[in-house]
Amino acid sequence: PVLLIMGANWCEDCRALDAALNSGKSAELLAREFKVVKVDVGNFDHNLDIDAAYGHPIAKGIPAAVVLSPDNQVIYATRAGELADARRMSETGIYEFFERV
């Protein structure tokens, strides 16, 4: 599956999630299970067509995530800002989140 991570470089939670996903067991999980694609949404003014195409996962905050099947169907998408407080999530919590999706 493809994992879209929608975020922005100004976003502290996006930077925290990125760091967590690039180290330890989370990095191993993502490398094994997903093709990861980062989507820059700027100040909620970039790539909004991608956000719209997958049901507006950024509506409740960023970072947001969408998991797509090989035929581009949404398997999972954040809808309630599940990752919008990523800086307060433990590395284990982030790993478990992506392990569930």
Regions found by a protein language model. Name each.
Residues 9, 41-42, 70-71:
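Solvent-exposed coil/turn segments that connect beta secondary-structure elements
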Residues 45-62, 71:
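Structural alpha/beta surface segment adjacent to cysteine/selenocysteine redox centers
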